[in-house]
From Swiss-Prot:
This is Ribose-phosphate pyrophosphokinase. The active site is at K193. Keywords: ATP-binding, Cytoplasm, Kinase, Magnesium, Metal-binding, Nucleotide biosynthesis, Nucleotide-binding, Transferase. Binds 2 Mg(2+) ions per subunit. It is found in: Cytoplasm. Its EC number is 2.7.6.1. Involved in the biosynthesis of the central metabolite phospho-alpha-D-ribosyl-1-pyrophosphate (PRPP) via the transfer of pyrophosphoryl group from ATP to 1-hydroxyl of ribose-5-phosphate (Rib-5-P). It comes from Pseudomonas syringae pv. tomato (strain ATCC BAA-871 / DC3000). InterPro entries: PRib_PP_synth_CS, Pribosyltran_N, PRibTrfase_dom, PRTase-like, Rib-P_diPkinase, Rib-P_diPkinase_bac.
Length: 313
């Protein structure tokens, strides 16, 4: 009899249901709500003693509520004698605060979150496309960071784009974009943003010939969509025939939907690590792919003590 059990909070129950469907097991029974003063309440409604528990809970908006749900659930499972607790965090919030720039008086919030997850008794963490790989080093427990690129690459291949070119929207994303370009066997372009003079707007230098090409911008997340929309504009101005964007995490905060609708971006393709808002679902230029099969396979391998890296060879 399998000891694996999968539970979820309120962050992304649809993804959790898709994952257990892939694993051919039922979704675990846990009640997660709030007390009248807004504090998180949780109760496990079935026996988990000796079980291999997986909690699927991205820490997306509302970030603090979803993070506290994860922490409180983990404590409940630990106190209920689960043999192992794995936090499956498809989107890891607070990941962008991972350093102190020039000794500024700021928190390293990614480290704070790592400490919180460890101290409540979580044994292992599974993430998808961490914003910065070094965050794995903030944990004193094993962290498996899997990639959304296979899902994105499969869809790009299915679209049968002509004269294709993968483009990194900034220098920081070159490694990710190069890996996608290599998988597809196509050219790589890079957008180098730089401010020539103080108080002047950024200038986008295009590295690579995009004239007449179908350009695909690749990034780990799309937040306000400002960078992608400006990049799409620069590519079109340099002669690109079409510009698409493929991003794993659809954060889509602030005026993101408005920015996308008013841009020259032909389409934004994302995964379901984060659920789309009603406005995002209604936007004809946004399409969502299912990452559940990849997450489910990683969960299965962890539970069976199999290699995770073998998934991406």
């Amino acid at each position: 009899m399998s000891k694996m059990m999968v539970f979820t909070g309120n962050a992304n129950p649809d993804l959790a249901r898709r994952v257990v469907r892939q694993l051919h097991i039922p979704l675990g029974d846990v009640s997660v709500g709030k007390f009248s003063d807004g504090e998180i309440s949780t109760e496990i409604n079935e026996n988990v003693r000796g079980k291999d528990v997986f909690i699927i809970q991205p820490t997306c908006a509302p970030t603090n509520d979803n993070l506290m749900e994860l922490v409180v659930m983990a404590d409940a499972f630990r106190r209920s004698s689960a043999s192992r607790i794995t936090a499956v965090i498809p989107y890891f919030g607070y990941a962008r605060q991972d350093r102190r720039p020039r000794s500024a008086r700021v928190a390293i919030s990614a480290k704070v979150v790592a400490d919180m997850l460890t101290v409540v008794g979580i044994d292992r963490v599974l993430t998808v496309d961490l914003h910065a790989d070094q965050i794995q080093g903030f944990f004193d427990i094993p962290v498996d960071n899997i990639y959304g690129s296979p899902v994105l690459v499969d869809d790009i291949e299915d679209q049968r784009f002509e004269n294709l070119m993968i483009v990194s929207p900034d220098i920081g994303g070159v490694v990710r974009a190069r890996a996608v370009a290599k998988s597809l066997g196509v050219d790589l372009g890079i957008i180098d943003k730089r401010r020539e003079k103080a108080n002047h707007s950024e200038v986008m230098h295009i590295i690579g010939d995009v004239e007449g090409r179908t350009c695909i911008l690749v990034d780990d997340m799309v937040d306000t969509a400002g960078t992608l929309c400006h990049a799409a504009k620069a590519l079109k101005e340099h002669g690109a025939a079409k510009v698409f964007a493929y991003c794993t995490h659809p954060v889509l905060s602030g005026r993101a939907i408005e920015n996308i609708e008013n841009s020259v971006l032909d389409e934004l393709v994302v995964t379901n690590t984060i659920p789309l808002s009603a406005a995002a679902q209604a936007c004809s230029r946004i399409r969502q792919l299912d990452i559940a099969p990849v997450v489910a396979e990683a969960v299965r391998r962890i539970s069976n003590e199999e290699s995770i890296s073998a998934m991406f060879r």
